[in-house]
Every structure is written in C-alpha cells, then in structure tokens.
Amino acid sequence: MAYLELDLQIATEETANLPSEADFRLWVEKALPEVDEEFEVTIRIVDEEESHALNHEYRGKDKPTNVLSFPFEAPPGLELPLLGDLVICAQIVAKEAAEQNKELFHHWAHMTIHGILHLRGYDHINDDEADEMESIETELLASLSISDPYLIKE
C-alpha cells in the first residue's frame, strides 16, 4: 500500500463546507497506484482570485478554474517521492456542484481524484485519453459509493 504525506493548505476565507483533511487523504489514496511507495502531495484550497491568477500564468486562460495540477518533475538522476501539487478553487467547485445538481461533497471527491490522476500522467486532451481517464474516475468514485459524475442530471 502507498504511503501518503499530505500537505493540506487552506488559502481561502470561505471555509464552510470544505472537506476534512481525512476526506482529502482518502480520495488521494484511492487515486494512487497500489504500490509500496511513498508519495508526497500538496493540496492548496484557494479562492477565485488565486485560481484565476494561476490559470492565467500557467495555462493562458483568463478565468478561474476548478482544479490545477502541477506534477513534480525531478531532475535526471534524482528520485524524490514528490507527486506534485493540486490547487482547487473552493468557489468554483461549489458553483459547479450547484449548476450540475451534484452533491458538493461528491464533487470535491471527483475534483481531487481528477487532479491526482493528472499528477499521475493521465490527461483528457483527446477522446481516447478522456475516455480512459473518465473510466478510471468513475470506477474510483463508485468504490466510494459516489455515482458517475459524467451522467447528466436533470
């Protein structure tokens, strides 16, 4: 089983309805490979202003976003257990959950797992990659008794 060193940073004043550190730990561990290795992950919960600034600087997108993933790339020959950093915008996650008629807690789980899969190298740039990533997310969420986040709810 993977060993996780989790650094949870709360950098938003809106802390109502945030998941606990134990929740984040569970979701991250679900998305890690089942290997006997150590992983270090930072999750930073931010406001829309910080999300917007980071999304603009690193992705060229002039708006806040739900989750940003920053994989750690060690220099050649250096092996460290750092997987990377996730930056999750609390306000965007809450807005999306409301707009998509999803339970807020479930959407937090989805965004965390989605971000960890990005840190592990998964992506959704093309349809095949998106299908694979969505399938893994759906399976991991189902193991937590969370329904398929890609099903449209009326």
From Swiss-Prot:
Binding positions for Zn(2+) per the UniProt entry: H114, H118, H124
Recorded GO CC terms: cytoplasm
MF (Gene Ontology): metalloendopeptidase activity; RNA endonuclease activity; zinc ion binding
SUPFAM superfamilies registered for this protein in UniProt: Metalloproteases ('zincins'), catalytic domain (SSF55486)
GO BP annotation list: rRNA processing
Keyword Acyltransferase attached: no
Enzyme class, spelled out: hydrolase
Family recorded in the similarity comment: Belongs to the endoribonuclease YbeY family.
Protein name according to UniProt: Endoribonuclease YbeY
